[in-house]
Amino acid sequence: MYNLYCTYMTGKRENVLIEALPYIREFHDSVMVIKVGGHAMVDPQVMSDIVQDIVLLRFVGIHPVIVHGGGPEITEKMDRMGKKSEFIGGLRITDDETMEIARMVLVGNINTRIVSLISKHGGKGVGLSGKDGNMILAKKKPTQKILIEDIEHDVDLGWVGDTEIINPEIINIVTANGYIPVISPIAMDSEGNALNINADTVAGDLADALNAKKLILMTDVPGVLRDQTDISTRISRIGVDEVEQLIEDGVLSGGMIPKMRSAKASVEGGVDRVHVIDGSISHSVLLELFTDQGIGTMVYKDTK
């Protein structure tokens, strides 16, 4: 995969452009939802490259919608405040204090930083959260059952939500006027309480509601690996019918579980393809979308 990257960076530039042309034509005027997250968020150069790619998508007639996470930065902030991070099934347990920290990091820090980068690269960004314009209405997740020493326990995840209703009107208005929406995964319940929703899940739900052509989920690994220690075991294509079996087999674990379930739900909901890519690779968005081989894992609907 890294050899592929080097090939494109050192090959003839005109060949790269010619290879990209049919993809640019195919994707023109389509919506693409791009979930930005992982440790790439804390590397300024990688983050700048990602945003530059997204601004380029807008300039060639594609309508990108950014959903961002911020898990590493939330964890770092909690560590500095002496608060322990706890996860169940890849989801952060979110009490009142954790919710306030998450909101501060996601809305007050990361969102504004991405909007500023869009402006730096010549685009126009608008920062939003799921609460704006009643964009994302959610309900609190039910208690989760976990096994501790073979004994089943109920665990309350706190202010963690499941999406109930997506109102895409504000996003459609923003994109129709040439802006790139940047969305924090903070939603609201029927009583006005803020709920933390997994960013991959939000991205998938928005992709469905917006009839997106593509959903791109960024992670810290080169896609789905059968062996987490060996990047040569990357699975380049996964049918939606394979996802639950891969979870059962232990190939998918931790934060990759909600990511791939979101990918599965999106494809089943009508999104053409979902791409899981390593956001730390320079210009990974362009390499995945506009080259024949791609660099990550593609989730598709098996029509057999």
Curated annotation (Swiss-Prot):
EC number: 2.7.2.8
Top EC category: transferase
GO MF annotations, alphabetized: acetylglutamate kinase activity; ATP binding
Main location: cytoplasm
Domain of life, per lineage: Archaea
Keywords: Amino-acid biosynthesis, Arginine biosynthesis, ATP-binding, Cytoplasm, Kinase, Nucleotide-binding, Transferase
Keyword Kinase: yes
Pathway named in the protein's UniProt entry: Amino-acid biosynthesis; L-arginine biosynthesis; N(2)-acetyl-L-ornithine from L-glutamate: step 2/4
Cellular component per GO, a single term: cytoplasm
One annotated GO biological process: L-arginine biosynthetic process
Subcellular location: Cytoplasm
Pfam (any one): AA_kinase
UniProt-annotated site: Transition state stabilizer, residues: K35, K259
Binding-site residues, substrate: G70, G71, R92, N196
Family: Belongs to the acetylglutamate kinase family. ArgB subfamily.
Purpose of the protein: Catalyzes the ATP-dependent phosphorylation of N-acetyl-L-glutamate.
HAMAP family noted in UniProt: ArgB (MF_00082)
Protein name as it appears in the record: Acetylglutamate kinase
